[in-house]
């Protein structure tokens, strides 16, 4: 019997990636997206942790779908900026800004920081909320150094 899970995101790339992983590992799971849920109200990310914001989104998804719901929150934590922008990464240059504007602002803010002191971590947290009330989170971090200009996708 195929199980269903909701991926509580509007990001088509995340949906494609999760579906690819499910096929790769031969799991009998159908992944639904927010487009499959009628009148889904986008929750505000009001927490100060990645875990808290991922849980807000997963809880909202589970409540509106009745299905197990997965959601994530992620961002960049720059040592020289006191680990900011952190949970505010997608809004660092203001609400509704594109990723490039947020990246450019971070780079302007650290332009006087020497190359050897541009440490940063990309943090991603995935939350799963089950209809029976159980909640799970997992966290991944990638540490590195910021360059002087945006590169990659």
Predicted regions and their residues:
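Anionic-ligand binding patches
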Residues: 2-6, 12-32, 36-153
